[in-house]
């Protein structure tokens, strides 16, 4: 029955070697698990980046720490890091301050050279007031200047060039010829205003007294005065200002009935040729 007895196998083993084998096996399994985790995270990140519906966050910007020792070594200085740090701060200023002369010295604006001297109005007796404009805009500019009582050949003169442009140059007030022209123009304007004012006053004075105009149909006269006249003072003023030449009060009133829209409305029922001044 010897063949039925189990064989007992015994042998010696190295416990230290077995411990090292177990540690190596554990370390190998941990490496495989870590590699698998990194692969899955990279795959997930690539899927997120490729997904247009996911909002990507911009990388944050952190301040850079300056190592003072490295700064001193790089600049070859000893214990002078304050000066180097100030240079870094000054060089990082994005809005440097410029003086007026530095900013406008020989700068160009739309093709014209502008110097700092031209920007200053206090240039002695030589006034450099020139405004270049296009020839097509001259009429509009002159009309605007006339609204401010600025007259050609009196307050300014016009010079043309070969570039389809003109210059409006301010005339000096010290020029005697310009001064005489200015006085003549002012006197002419004052005469016109006096004439206009006298005409307006004469017509208004007559309306205060009243006028009688014969009816076109029927008998009798219609009395018109300042209280019942159809036009307004503004309307009357605009019409009287267009009267040319010497006119009598009766002629100016007839002119008023022909030119004023308000007076025209009653002109059809009146015979203005038969008028009596009260």
Swiss-Prot record:
* Post-translational modification as stated in the protein's UniProt record: Phosphorylated by host kinases.
Q: Which UniProt keywords apply?
A: Chaperone, Host cytoplasm, Phosphoprotein, Viral RNA replication, Virion
Where does it mainly reside?
virion
Q: Name which cysteines form disulfide bonds.
A: none
| Superkingdom in the source lineage | Viruses
Q: Does the keyword Cell cycle apply?
A: no
Q: State if Membrane is listed as a keyword.
A: no
Q: What is any one of the record's Gene Ontology cellular component terms?
A: virion component
Q: Where in the cell is it found?
A: Virion; Host cytoplasm
Q: How does it assemble?
A: Homotrimer when phosphorylated. This trimer is stabilized by binding to the L protein. Binds soluble protein N, and ribonucleocapsid.
- What role is this protein assigned? Non catalytic polymerase cofactor and regulatory protein that plays a role in viral transcription and replication. Stabilizes the RNA polymerase L to the N-RNA template and binds the soluble protein N, preventing it from encapsidating non-genomic RNA.
Q: What is this protein called?
A: Phosphoprotein
Organism, by scientific name, is Bovine ephemeral fever virus (strain BB7721)
